[in-house]
């Protein structure tokens, strides 16, 4: 047996060897740090026995997959601790996630004191150092095992597996769980962990199922790494849009209205309107024409597009096909509507490309368990567009769509925070898609070549394409590390035929156009959440709901403050006057907490000279200035959408 290691070196063995034995053969230090193995790209237990030629990488907690194994084992230790302290608790699932791990239990909610007690029990379990053993059972025996244990959620999971399947289990001491693995060799490998919070979660993410209690935690290989992560989590909490957005009166949610249906408050509307005007003006400069299409349509439209067969579960359907004459659905996207705008007229090859833009309100029937602030909602607004092009125009127009997206990211100051993904079809799951394999391979090849020509680093994600075409997804992580798609640009060589779209070529013949589906900035709600977290609420001045606050030092300067305010408003500056009878220090602190970028302090000297004293969050005290000079500077900053660097800390201002 020849084992090829990550560095290309090879080891030859006359007999089968376990991954951990090979790790020791390489280095005792590596073996001690090992969490799992990676055989031909697949993570496996260290106890896995190899008996044929393969490629092997020993995974440690420094590797993403290795850290996931450590965290997965930590979730099992958590579950064992909970059932030790709360014997009536039923276990559901407990995976590793990007930021740690969680486990779901059917039991009453946990308090912070409960979590502290569970942590202590986990430490006891780890100190005992039980080895982790893997074994298998038949499907029938596994069902019987969990029925005897009175674990209904595990029974359901096993029952969903195919007949004849071999079911894997992991045990640590006298506690056993259903699990595909891999896991550490011993619970002793969980050296640094922390239980973070407890919340509610529906079983399998569906509100139709039981509400469970979820415990979140995280784990690292060392206490220093854990400490660093916890400090980052504190900063994340400070920036979390779901908390900060409410504090800043940007949005709120109300139970009686429903999950995933945020109310955008006046401050949030100001930001969204600024973004919308900017995007629409930019699209107009780039040759887009605007449409306004209905929020719903008959099911017939979605049957033509294929959404009825491939996306119906994600739509809000109004009516019953069996009893109602007409069934409608709220639109989950704008594309089929804009196709009929195109079809309303005949087009020649000279008319193309046609670029349609629309600020669209869309509806998607997401599970309740997926709802979160502004990032996962059921109704949202999006800068949607569709380009109808000749095949020979496709590459240039697609690149131009990427350029528009990059321009938007650059203006918002987030171009360094995103990753690019080529989302491809899954040839092993063809029923999910329309079109022939050769069309998919060709279109994916075009996108791959474009990204390479543009020197854009990207990853390829199988199975992430829409049902009618591959796409470029531009993703960003929130403050907790969860990745969301911000912008999508999609190649579609198929739906023009579904809708019988054509143009007349130079020979007078009908030809099928290609279609580009794209967003320039993406979903406004998600972008707003992203910006709140990126800037901790301290938006660039052009986006700030309140750009200037005038602060008179006493009541006798209210009239002058009002004159300053009036002049600011005449010049389009969003401002207010703080006329409260409070100490100056308090009013200045309040303006900082409201994240107002500029304060204009006015008193006797300023009134006498017709000036203002400027304090900014960028430089602190900027001195006394002519109001006209301040106006010229802030108007230029707003016009250019400048992102000023904060040079001084709040406490030094």
At which residue positions do the language-model features occur?
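NTP/phosphate- and nucleic-acid-binding module
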Residues: 1-90, 97-653
């Amino acid at each position: 047996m020849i084992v090829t290691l990550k560095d290309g070196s090879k080891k030859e063995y006359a007999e089968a060897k376990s991954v951990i034995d090979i790790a020791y053969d390489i280095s005792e230090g590596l073996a001690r740090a090992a969490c799992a193995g990676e055989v031909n790209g697949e993570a496996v237990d260290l106890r896995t026995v190899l008996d044929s030629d393969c490629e092997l990488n020993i995974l440690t907690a420094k590797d993403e997959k290795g850290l996931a194994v450590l965290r997965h084992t930590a979730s099992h230790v958590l579950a064992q601790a909970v059932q030790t302290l709360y014997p009536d608790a039923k276990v559901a699932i407990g995976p590793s996630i990007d930021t740690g791990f969680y486990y779901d239990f059917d039991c009453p909610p946990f308090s912070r004191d409960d979590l502290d007690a569970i942590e202590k029990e986990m430490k006891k379990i780890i100190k005992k150092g039980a080895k982790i053993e893997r074994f298998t059972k038949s499907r029938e025996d596994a069902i019987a095992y969990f029925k005897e244990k009175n674990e209904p959620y595990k029974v359901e999971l096993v029952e969903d597996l195919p007949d004849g399947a071999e079911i894997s289990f992991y045990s640590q001491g006298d506690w056993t769980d259903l699990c595909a693995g891999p896991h550490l060799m011993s619970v002793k490998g969980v050296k640094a962990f922390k239980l973070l919070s407890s919340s509610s979660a529906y079983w399998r993410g569906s509100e139709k199922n039981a509400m469970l209690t979820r415990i979140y935690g995280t784990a690292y290989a060392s206490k220093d790494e854990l400490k660093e992560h916890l400090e980052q989590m504190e900063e994340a909490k400070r920036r979390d849009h779901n908390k900060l957005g409410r504090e800043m009166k940007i949005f709120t949610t109300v139970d009686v209205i429903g999950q995933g249906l945020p109310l955008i408050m006046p401050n949030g509307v100001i930001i969204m309107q600024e973004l919308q005007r900017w995007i629409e003006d930019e699209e107009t400069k780039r040759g887009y024409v605007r449409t306004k299409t209905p929020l719903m349509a008959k099911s017939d439209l979605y049957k033509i597009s294929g959404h009825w067969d491939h996306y119906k579960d994600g739509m809000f359907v109004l009516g019953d096909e069996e009893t109602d004459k007409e069934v409608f659905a709220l639109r989950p996207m704008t594309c089929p509507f804009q196709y009929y705008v195109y079809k309303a007229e005949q087009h020649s090859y000279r008319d193309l490309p046609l670029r349609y833009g629309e600020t669209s309100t869309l509806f998607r029937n997401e599970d309740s368990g997926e709802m979160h602030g502004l990032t996962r909602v059921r109704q949202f607004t999006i800068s949607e567009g569709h380009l109808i092009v000749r095949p020979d125009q496709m590459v240039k127009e697609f690149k131009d769509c990427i350029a528009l997206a990059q321009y938007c990211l650059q203006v918002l100051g987030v171009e360094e925070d995103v990753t690019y993904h080529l989302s491809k079809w899954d040839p092993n799951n063809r029923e999910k898609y329309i079109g022939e394999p050769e069309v998919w391979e060709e279109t994916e090849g075009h996108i791959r070549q474009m990204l390479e020509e543009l020197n854009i680093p990207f990853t390829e994600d199988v199975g992430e394409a829409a049902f009618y075409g591959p796409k470029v997804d531009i993703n960003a992580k929130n403050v907790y590390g969860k990745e969301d798609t911000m912008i999508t640009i999609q190649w579609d060589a198929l739906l023009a035929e579904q809708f019988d779209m054509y143009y007349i070529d130079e020979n007078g013949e009908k030809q099928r156009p290609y279609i580009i589906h794209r967003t320039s900035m993406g979903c406004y709600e998600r972008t707003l959440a992203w910006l709140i977290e990126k800037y901790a609420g301290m938006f660039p001045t052009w986006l700030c709901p309140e750009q200037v606050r005038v602060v008179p030092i006493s009541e006798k300067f209210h009239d002058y403050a009002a004159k300053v305010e009036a002049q600011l408003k005449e010049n389009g500056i969003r401002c207010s006057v703080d006329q409260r009878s409070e100490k100056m220090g308090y009013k200045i602190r309040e303006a900082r907490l409201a994240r107002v970028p500029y304060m204009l302090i006015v008193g006797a000297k300023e009134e006498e000279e017709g000036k203002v004293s400027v304090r900014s969050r960028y430089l602190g005290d900027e001195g006394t200035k002519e109001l006209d000079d301040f106006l010229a500077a802030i108007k230029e900053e707003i016009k250019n959408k400048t992102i000023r660097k904060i040079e001084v800390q709040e406490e030094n201002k």
